[in-house]
Amino acid sequence: MNTLVIVLIAAVCLLGAYTLYGRWLANKWGIDPTAKTPAVVHEDGRDYVPTNGWTVFAHQFSSIAGAGPVTGAIQAAAFGWLPVLLWVLLGGIFFGAVTDFGALYASVKNDGKSMGMLIEKYIGKTGRKLFLLFCWLFCGIVIAAFADMVAGTFNAFGADGALVEAAQTNGAAGMVSIMFMVFAVVLGLIQKKFNFSGWKESVISIVFIVLSFVIGANLPLILGKAAWSYITFVYIFFAAVLPMWLLKQPRDHMTTFMFVAMIAGAVVGLLVAHPTMNLPVFTGFTNEKLGTMFPILFVTVACGAVSGFHSLVSSGTSSKTVENEKDMLKVGYGAMILESLLAVLALCVAGAAAAADGTPAAGTPFQIFSRGVAGFFEMFGVPAYAATVFMTMCVSALALTSLDAVARIGRMSFQELFSVDDMEHAEGWRKLLCNVYFSTFITLVFGFILTKIGYANIWPLFGSANQLLSALVLSTLCVFLKVTGRSNKMLFPPLVIMLCVTFTALVQRLMAMVKAISNAAAVTIPAGETTWGAVFIANGLQLILAVLLIVLGLNIVFHSFSAYKKAEHNSEAKA
């Protein structure tokens, strides 16, 4: 099948869903353009900052569009491109976008409270503590994985200490990234001083993007992975503590232009070349490497269709910057729809890169996507070096923009975990733990330690944990909508399905870990404990975490169900 046809069908479905279903949700729940948002009421210059709607959209999209939509869609294509396409469209429209929009809506209607605080209000303090602990651990794992990914992308040296073939390109992309950070601060100061917005802000952003690429391409920074790792953690520390307007928002705004150029390059490339989708339509309900389609397809596609992490961004940062309630639809629902389109593009690029017999292209999903889109740019006359640097930067930016968002959310989760209502008279140790700088430091140290001791041993659980997070958010939204007298029945199908998906995936993973450990013990204990110990390190951490996730998830679901039964319809005045 022609990949262009697939993209056009997806684009029509997604745009139609935003226009019809998204607006229906907004009308059903109620949007008040005259209401004062938390950003206006609680403006503090750091987290609560009234911001132009499109700038908030840029922040939301760049923060949620991490590695997931590209890697997930391409990896899940092992089941065939049709199941992936169907889940991305159905999941994005009826699951992911609804969850993101709902989380943003609930937070804005509750003074910008994060999801943890919303859970305390509608489900209880125990549920809140459990959820915040889960969020903080989740953020630590994501920080470790994405920081390692970014450092690896910019790394110029191989294991033997010699320069790798792509050293020049990697170093250039790294320098571009640093210049992005520098110019983001300059852009933030300009916006603050002159109150620029709209086309003026966009023109300045584009100029800074061009300057960043010119400087980076001509002055590559050749460093090893360890050095880039330190630079990455220093950056995300400042991104987590500095005011949103000074670094995070302007960087997201600039990055979004780059993402739009990447998406446009992919779309135009598919339009001009209209390559054939070489991946098979459907390979079966079981895959030798991945397992059964249910639930693996759903947890593998992850962010391209639905992601619990998105709700943390919606309620953790975006809700505190929305200037007008009318912007919530494009920020919450629209950003997710665009991410689903990105997942479809990644699927089509991978399909075009596959061999005629259906054999997938060699390399990681990021490498496949990067090479494919860079090839499209070269088709339009862009020099190979420039195209490769651009795509390397885009790939790293997908991880970086999520990384600085999750660092900030992790910091907030840690603060909320130990905070009390009367912080002014709280104990000294509690004030220390809730300090912005200390909580950020602890969060990043946790992530940094995971990069050193092997986060890869627990990373396979990321997909399940992420989807469990979305189910927990949906359960909270059901209670919120009920007590405020709003319709919540559209949340029931995604809630039930996501609970089935996540708990099935976790139980399957748990059983696989038990089997791997017991098999290794049976084979190696008579001869020695070396092999068994290695297997336990690789699988034991997953086993322990899987059990914790199941217990934690069931506990929160139980509290949510209990709260829902006790909650009276329309018992709380509509915000």
Where are each of the predicted segments found?
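Transmembrane helix-loop junctions in multi-pass membrane proteins
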Residues: 2, 69-70, 82, 141-163, ...
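Extracellular loop-to-transmembrane helix junctions
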Residues: 2-19, 76-107, 116, 174-184, ...
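Membrane-interface loop-to-helix entry segments
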Residues: 16-30, 134, 171-215, 225-272, ...
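Membrane-interface "cap" regions at the ends of multi-pass membrane proteins
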Residues: 16-70, 256, 292, 296
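Flexible loop linkers connecting adjacent transmembrane helices
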Residues: 23-49, 72-75, 85, 89, ...
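Membrane-helix boundary/coupling elements in multi-pass transport proteins
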Residues: 67-74, 91-99, 103, 107-111, ...
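Extracellular/periplasmic helix-exit of transmembrane alpha-helices
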Residues: 101, 270-284, 334-372
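Loop-to-transmembrane helix boundary motifs in multi-pass membrane proteins
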Residues: 125-140, 334-340, 387, 416-452
